[in-house]
UniProtKB/Swiss-Prot annotation:
<dbReference type="GO" id="GO:0034227">
    <property type="term" value="P:tRNA thio-modification"/>
</dbReference>
<feature type="modified residue" description="1-thioglycine">
    <location>
        <position position="101"/>
    </location>
</feature>
<keyword id="KW-0833">Ubl conjugation pathway</keyword>
<protein>
    <recommendedName>
        <fullName>Ubiquitin-related modifier 1</fullName>
    </recommendedName>
</protein>
<dbReference type="GO" id="GO:0005829">
    <property type="term" value="C:cytosol"/>
</dbReference>
<keyword id="KW-0819">tRNA processing</keyword>
<comment type="similarity">
    <text>Belongs to the URM1 family.</text>
</comment>
<comment type="function">
    <text>Acts as a sulfur carrier required for 2-thiolation of mcm(5)S(2)U at tRNA wobble positions of cytosolic tRNA(Lys), tRNA(Glu) and tRNA(Gln). Serves as sulfur donor in tRNA 2-thiolation reaction by being thiocarboxylated (-COSH) at its C-terminus by the MOCS3 homolog UBA4. The sulfur is then transferred to tRNA to form 2-thiolation of mcm(5)S(2)U. Prior mcm(5) tRNA modification by the elongator complex is required for 2-thiolation. Also acts as a ubiquitin-like protein (UBL) that is covalently conjugated via an isopeptide bond to lysine residues of target proteins such as AHP1.</text>
</comment>
<keyword id="KW-0963">Cytoplasm</keyword>
<keyword id="KW-1017">Isopeptide bond</keyword>
<dbReference type="InterPro" id="IPR012675">
    <property type="entry name" value="Beta-grasp_dom_sf"/>
</dbReference>
<dbReference type="InterPro" id="IPR015221">
    <property type="entry name" value="Urm1"/>
</dbReference>
<comment type="pathway">
    <text>tRNA modification; 5-methoxycarbonylmethyl-2-thiouridine-tRNA biosynthesis.</text>
</comment>
<feature type="cross-link" description="Glycyl lysine isopeptide (Gly-Lys) (interchain with K-? in acceptor proteins)">
    <location>
        <position position="101"/>
    </location>
</feature>
<dbReference type="GO" id="GO:0032447">
    <property type="term" value="P:protein urmylation"/>
</dbReference>
<dbReference type="GO" id="GO:0002098">
    <property type="term" value="P:tRNA wobble uridine modification"/>
</dbReference>
<dbReference type="Pfam" id="PF09138">
    <property type="entry name" value="Urm1"/>
</dbReference>
Amino acid sequence: MVRVIIEFLGGLDVIVKKQRQYKVDVQLDGKDEINVGDLIQWIVDNLIEHEGDVNVFLENDSIRPGILTLINDTDWELEGEKEYVLEDGDVVSFTSTLHGG
């Protein structure tokens, strides 16, 4: 199990029960280490309310282009993207950069 904070910013909160921040314990059967890829699937399974909203968040089984993903305020590309192994206290932020204006 890992305890993390997940943030949905830039309007993404509308697909996750209109809540911008979650403090969650993520536990997956048979896994000692939980990576960001596991967390993304956990979000789809547990936080996204409507199946149709999954495509707002994901494209081709990864975070949709236009969503900035940070792990502890560092671009996830520098941290290994979906392979980054989460640790207690990590903050994972998803920020949509695509919005009207």
